[in-house]
Amino acid sequence: MEALRQRIEAAFETRQDISPSSVEPSVRADVETVINMLDKGQARVAEKIDGEWHVHQWLKKAVLLSFRIFDNGVIEGGDTKYFDKVPQKFADYDEARFKAEGIRVVPPATVRKGSFIGKNTVLMPSYVNLGAYVDEGTMVDTWATVGSCAQIGKNVHLSGGVGIGGVLEPLQAGPTIIEDNCFIGARSEIVEGVVVEEGSVISMGVYIGQSTRIFDRETGEVHYGRVPAGSVVVSGNLPSACGTYSLYAAIIVKKVDAKTRGKVGINELLRIVD
């Protein structure tokens, strides 16, 4: 793995000189190896080690190299055709393979090769970009999008129209991460490498980026780029220092533990926030 990483890093430094017609066969083979590893879940762009998320930038570099290496090609898609550099993940799947992996895919869901889909996931008509990791037991609901290299945990529900931001460039940025057992309400957007920690519930229509203030009304704390574990979050506003206007903020209205979540439905958690 270390030798592969070094070769990818070296190739990335010369990426401006790489094209589908000029790429060295060895570089193409290395990039294909990485894409296949990401596709099978043998590698992931970010992983939690000792309680902290670590980003493997070289894997992101391999994904970026793939756009310079692979040319557009025709992709069959039911009653139509597409023309793109990245093939479809399920293009070669048959019934036996879908059953073996425990994946349910509702047309016209689109998943690009190089993304991992865990067992017992359900993909409604949605979009999953390459480099993404969707763990087992997760529901990606209708018109939800999972951006490039985003990390989605186990037993997550991404409701209709949810947007999880991708982040290939700028390269130093971390991917957007939704940890295990989270619920993201309809039409919410979580972007720019924000981490939603385990067991959190995000209400409908909440928008969180790195500059969004995440206000905990119980403690008065303001967080940026991170929703603490077990938070129940709704959209709101905070007053300006001068008191003449207010600006959008995400408001943590309560905290819940796994036991409470197991006993109380999501709608009930969100119903009383006063």
UniProtKB/Swiss-Prot annotation:
Pfam families: Hexapep_2, THDPS_N_2. It is an enzyme of class 2 (transferase). InterPro entries: DapD_Trfase_Hexpep_rpt_fam (IPR005664), Hexapep (IPR001451), Hexapep_transf_CS (IPR018357), THP_succinylTrfase_dom1 (IPR023180), THP_succinylTrfase_N_sf (IPR037133), Trimer_LpxA-like_sf (IPR011004). CDD domains: LbH_THP_succinylT. GO terms for cellular component: cytoplasm. Its EC number is 2.3.1.117. It is found in: Cytoplasm. Keywords: Acyltransferase, Amino-acid biosynthesis, Cytoplasm, Diaminopimelate biosynthesis, Lysine biosynthesis, Repeat, Transferase. It catalyses: (S)-2,3,4,5-tetrahydrodipicolinate + succinyl-CoA + H2O = (S)-2-succinylamino-6-oxoheptanedioate + CoA. Pathway: Amino-acid biosynthesis; L-lysine biosynthesis via DAP pathway; LL-2,6-diaminopimelate from (S)-tetrahydrodipicolinate (succinylase route): step 1/3. Substrate binds at R104, D141. GO terms for biological process: diaminopimelate biosynthetic process; lysine biosynthetic process via diaminopimelate. One of its GO terms (molecular function) is 2,3,4,5-tetrahydropyridine-2,6-dicarboxylate N-succinyltransferase activity. Homotrimer. HAMAP family: DapD (MF_00811). Belongs to the transferase hexapeptide repeat family. PANTHER family: 2,3,4,5-TETRAHYDROPYRIDINE-2,6-DICARBOXYLATE N-SUCCINYLTRANSFERASE, MOLYBDENUM COFACTOR GUANYLYLTRANSFERASE. This is 2,3,4,5-tetrahydropyridine-2,6-dicarboxylate N-succinyltransferase. It comes from Shewanella frigidimarina (strain NCIMB 400).
